[in-house]
Amino acid sequence: MLEALLLGVVEGLTEFLPISSTAHLMLIGDMLGFEGPPGKTYEIVVQLGAILAVCVVFRQRLWGVATTITQPRSFAFARNVMVAFLPAAVIGATLYKYIKQMLESPLVAAIALVVGGVAILVIERLVKRARIHDIEDMSPALALGVGFCQVLAMVPGVSRAGATIMGSMLLGLDRRAAAEFSFFLAIPTMCGASAYSLYKNWATLSFDGAGLIALGFVAAFLSALVVVKGFIGFVGRHGFAPFAWYRIAFGSLMAVLILMR
């Protein structure tokens, strides 16, 4: 029970921060021996818990877009999210086997954590003035650019949130808009990834310990709820440097532990 609760909390806390939930789940899951088909079922379900948190926090905005989709700004919002989703959908489905092989390499994740941390520090220094303050004001080409940045997150340890937020900032979005776009882009991306993973692993999935899986879902939902509500305010005050230094420290520790085996 403690293992399921811990991994659910880790998923919820790390999924929407630029620190790679995959790397954290990989290391902690390996330490706890939480692997195999039941582990895959658990991984898929807890991701859905994290997605639900975004939908709950931004429910009014999502509902507003859905009910006014024919209006120009609502249409632009939905268009930009879906355009940004396309590269990951197409490339992810095409390269699924290779991505799965990479996901089995904790050392790759550790190196990506460190490299990504350094990249965040560099980008924070490079980006001085944003020119886009709302998702609706993005062009389709810019949204597509963010989508290709998201593809980088297929390498474990890169972080989907980190790649999309930093990519958005490099392309002209301010911190708040970049963070929000990353949240909204997570909805189709994570739902699509979960659905594709279900399809590919259906024959080996197991719902043994359904109670523990449900516990992980709830833990991921509640912890993600806290993160999503507080993240934008935090980066507005402190920027992304704290996450960069954490990545470098955690990635280095992860690499040392792996090499000491």
Swiss-Prot record:
Q: What is its EC number?
A: 3.6.1.27
Q: Kindly list the places in or outside the cell where this protein is found, as annotated in its UniProt entry.
A: Cell inner membrane
InterPro entries membership:
UppP
Name the coiled-coil region(s).
none
**Major location category of this protein:** membrane
Membrane topology, as annotated, equals:
Multi-pass membrane protein
This entry's Gene Ontology molecular function terms read:
undecaprenyl-diphosphatase activity
- Residues spanning the membrane: 1-21, 38-58, 75-95, 103-123, 138-158, 178-198, 212-232, 240-260
Lineage top rank: taxon:
Bacteria
Q: What class of enzyme is it?
A: hydrolase
As its record notes, the protein acts as a catalyst of: di-trans,octa-cis-undecaprenyl diphosphate + H2O = di-trans,octa-cis-undecaprenyl phosphate + phosphate + H(+)
Q: Which GO terms describe its biological process?
A: cell wall organization; peptidoglycan biosynthetic process; regulation of cell shape; response to antibiotic
Q: Which GO terms describe its cellular component?
A: plasma membrane
Q: A Pfam family for this UniProt protein?
A: BacA
The UniProt keywords, alphabetically, are: Antibiotic resistance, Cell inner membrane, Cell membrane, Cell shape, Cell wall biogenesis/degradation, Hydrolase, Membrane, Peptidoglycan synthesis, Transmembrane, Transmembrane helix
More about this protein: Bacitracin is thought to be involved in the inhibition of peptidoglycan synthesis by sequestering undecaprenyl diphosphate, thereby reducing the pool of lipid carrier available.
Q: What does this protein do?
A: Catalyzes the dephosphorylation of undecaprenyl diphosphate (UPP). Confers resistance to bacitracin.
Q: Its family?
A: Belongs to the UppP family.
Q: What is this protein called?
A: Undecaprenyl-diphosphatase 2
